[in-house]
Structure formats: C-alpha cells, structure tokens
Amino acid sequence: MRDNRRQAIRFTEFMDSFAIPYTMVFGNHDCEMGATCKKEELAAIYEQGRYAIFTAGREELTGVGNFLIELTDAAGQVLLPLVLLDSNMYGEGGWFYSGFDRIHEDQTRWCMERLDALKAQDPTVRAMAFFHMPPREFKEAYEKMKLGDRAV
C-alpha cells in the first residue's frame, strides 16, 4: 500500500514552508498502485494548505479539482484566467492497462461556460489551461506534423 495521504500532507507542508501561493492539478498518478487515499480525500488535504489556491470543485463534474483562478489587476479586472482540470485516471476498467482517461465533455463544457462569461465582460481576455495528461488532439497534431502537414 502506498500512503498517499501522508505524502499529500508532507507536500502541503513543504509548499506552505515557502510562504507563496501555489496550486496543483490531479492526473493519473495520484491514487494508483494501491494508494490508501482517494482524490476527494487528497483534495480535502490540499484545500487546507495555508498558501494553497485549490478547491475540489463541483461534485457533479467528472474528476476532482476542476476550477478557475482569476488573476486580476488592482481594480479587479480579470487579466488572465487560469483553468485547472483533472485529466482523470485510466479509461474503461479503471486501471493501468485499460488505457489513459481524458478530460471529459462535462469538464470542457463547464470550462467554456466560465470563459464565455469572462469574455462577455472583456472580449480580449485570454486564458491558460493546466492539466496532467495532454488531450488526444495533441497526439493527432503531432502525428500530422511528423508526416509534414504544415497546417498543424
């Protein structure tokens, strides 16, 4: 058994020791190989970090830790939204040999709704997204690029 609860506590204490804000995203390694703690439990630990900017997010969305950080200026104008998405664990069957999971449609829909609302206030706003595993489209683009497709 892997004591990922203890590791999460130690990680949070370590990051808090720098006294600067930090965040994280979940991926496929957080609860694998006999880990003792699920993502929901890890999220509760991370949410307690003194300098952590982290939330478990909405329960109805696939994954844990889907949230948006709005970087603003002194007047409260959003300069850069940071989107953090759980790229989840493994595909059908739920374990390593079943293939990797992905960012799901409900997560994408939620993300776009949030960004559309920000764009309604300021059409020039751009966002950055952070997640552990790249979307399948990255692989498709990479393969096209290797074959010489300059449109990628």
Regions found by a protein language model. Name each.
Residues 6-123:
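Extended active-site neighborhood of metal-dependent phosphoesterases/phosphodiesterases
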